[in-house]
Amino acid sequence: MINPIVKTIELGDGRTITLETGKLAKQADGSVMLRMGNTMLLATVCAAKDAVPGTDFMPLQVEYKEKFAAFGRFPGGFTKREGRASDYEILTCRLVDRALRPLFPDNYHAEVYVNIILFSADGVDMPDALAGLAASAALAVSDIPFNGPISEVRVARIDGKFVINPTFDQLEQADMDIMVAATYENIMMVEGEMSEVSEAELLEAMKVAHEAIKVHCKAQMELTEMVGKTVKREYCHEENDEELRKAVHDACYDKSYAIAASGNRNKHERQDAFDAIRDEFKAQFSEEELEEKGALIDRYYHDVEKEAMRRCILDEGKRLDGRKTTEIRPIWCEVGYLPGPHGSAIFTRGETQSLTSVTLGTKLDEKIIDDVLAHGKERFLLHYNFPPFSTGEAKAQRGVGRREIGHGNLAHRALKRMIPEDYPYVVRVVSDILESNGSSSMATVCAGTLALMDAGVKIKKPVSGIAMGLIKNAGEEKYAVLSDILGDEDHLGDMDFKVTGTKDGITATQMDIKVDGLSYEILERALNQAKEGRMHILGKIEETISEPRTELKDHAPRIETMTIPKEFIGAVIGPGGKIIQGMQEETGATITIEEIDNVGRIEISGTNKKSIDDAIRLIKGIVAVPEVGEVYKGKVRSIMPYGAFVEFLPGKDGLLHISEIDWKRLETVEEAGIKEGDEIEVKLIDIDPKTGKFKLSRKVLLPRPEKK
């Protein structure tokens, strides 16, 4: 009989979360089944016993997978089986990875695999907000070294009140949606979108989230005690030579500090200078000695380089490229650079450059979303590409990676609330990073704003973005908040805090922290300093283009929308789509129709106004209600001995009796010169109340001859 160990977390709103271990996946180093309502996630962790020789980083791999069976659904596609990870699953992986990675010991290099699987879902509670807790709990019941526990929660603001882990329905009403990860003591990661909130409101949301996370962390500590996994495995993944470490520091620190303080703005020249110092030190050793000590020298020199850069900033306020801590790199922008797309822009900030294009599409271009729990259509798309040449790397470009999906998602969230809800076009923004030295996702936001305005998209307000950094040594009061960080400042610093927004508030944020003990005072200073930087960048954007263009590019599609009564939808489509397809062939316009809120919504698009006007005329003809006494221009469809049948509205034929053709008596219709295909004006004089047949007259429109 299996006796699983269960820990229950009581939430403030009456809901509960249970963490169960010892029942499933017992051969993993740690496994926990998390349950909230009918949502169940299994998290497992496995770690190699030893590190791969030569590994000097943390080889952590996080996988998140949603089973379609969890929600009682079949996967799509020919194989009817789960395939490669969706963007949503990749983004959830990244949320968990970014929270866990900083908390493994610096000298722990064994491969660690975290797998989180959604086995049951009810469509009410959101599983991505629970994945971090499940993963941390699995680590907590394992013997893998980890300086946790952590947890993640989603906090949303609905009608002015903060809600922890809202339901799908609640989130639709929120004006703030952020994910926060933290240990019991410190916030580690933040990511989310919002409707132009203030810095103080964002900080308040983070504090509310942290209080909820503390409850989760305490429960995991108690679960660890219950399982008896308080002692972690021993490991030795790094061998050190303290004499060599001291020799590297003594020989290289002053030279490295001089490079760090030189203010060279060219990152390749600067790195070459740093590398030359290391190579000079290595030159004193033989090839045999370097085989033994070369990797250690590289690691120790990296520490020297890091210390020199950090001390230069803290002690002198000098950054690697010579800027002050609050200074933004030089910016230049250009719009309309590419003639082919419907809008384009170049945004260059220092050595980071984005070339962004905008394409306007119709309803047929909507992205269909068919994930396990998310269904619908996306009308605003943003794609981010980061080719190797942007950093001068000589390597092949593979498919879209997790990083590109994550950076694109952040820029998408920064801009999407600025697109009017009733905007008729489907919009695709593509950012190609051509140069990169930090903050490329923020360059995408700025270039995206410029390109959207160049395309004539009526965005509500321009958006700018900035990446902030932090230098803070443990045990020191002194710290430095850096505006518009370089790639090296991101790598060697303690924080990467990206903030985007308009002149009136923040629209999106993403923060990763690598140090303990980061106070809310420091976060507040970083947010306020970010606001100053955002306003400066926004000014540069508005100098280039101050508002959206009033006219679309000549080759952009034109779109008109109209609504019709629900009962006419079938008439517009026709049997097997015959009518709507015929109208498209006749006019050259693209016509789509759907039922929304009990009415038919029609979208007509084309490359010229005439095709759209012709399509509108035909549709109006179909949905028009024939009125007795109205005059119509009709087409003679057939000739009979007793008269002619005339199509006076699309799909509506009436009888023009021979006696109604002319005032004089006719023996045949042809006597009046009427033949099939002729267009003639007729008046609707009657509708048979029983059969609904239409009676037409031509003679009432002709002058009546005087009686002799």
From Swiss-Prot:
Keywords: Cytoplasm, Magnesium, Metal-binding, Nucleotidyltransferase, RNA-binding, Transferase. One of its GO terms (cellular component) is cytosol. Its cofactor is Mg(2+). It is found in: Cytoplasm. Residues 557-619 form the KH domain. Its EC number is 2.7.7.8. GO terms for molecular function: 3'-5'-RNA exonuclease activity; magnesium ion binding; polyribonucleotide nucleotidyltransferase activity; RNA binding. Gene3D superfamilies: GHMP Kinase, N-terminal domain, K Homology domain, type 1, Nucleic acid-binding proteins. Residues 629-699 form the S1 motif domain. Its main location: cytoplasm. Mg(2+) binds at residues 490, 496. It catalyses: RNA(n+1) + phosphate = RNA(n) + a ribonucleoside 5'-diphosphate. GO terms for biological process: mRNA catabolic process; RNA processing. Involved in mRNA degradation. Catalyzes the phosphorolysis of single-stranded polyribonucleotides processively in the 3'- to 5'-direction. Belongs to the polyribonucleotide nucleotidyltransferase family. This is Polyribonucleotide nucleotidyltransferase. It comes from Bacteroides fragilis (strain ATCC 25285 / DSM 2151 / CCUG 4856 / JCM 11019 / LMG 10263 / NCTC 9343 / Onslow / VPI 2553 / EN-2).
